[in-house]
């Protein structure tokens, strides 16, 4: 069994001098991060899809054993029914594929308004996702934690 430990970000200037060595430049944050941690939630992808060149630099600056766990962009997860955004989700997955073995589970964080009444939409969306992609779903509407959904 492999255990991975990480944070949702690596680019935090407040870590310079304690978590990162004193004088570490932002361009070197990822290289320093992977010296201590083995995974990253990848919260930046929630706000914007990275350019392919950015993904390439992530590969170049991390060992093959490192795992990126990108968050599905909010433009997909927070804009209504997921099924309407299947193509955009597949495009996002393809942007992440160059991570190769570094690609860990992806996170689909649902907004608090996404209730169990949309379970059919969620199931249809997940059914259309590639089977080789691991996808974790975070529900936030309180009704998900009530019977019969708990």
What is each stretch, according to the model?
Residues 1-150:
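Residues lining hydrophobic/aromatic ligand-binding pockets adjacent to catalytic sites
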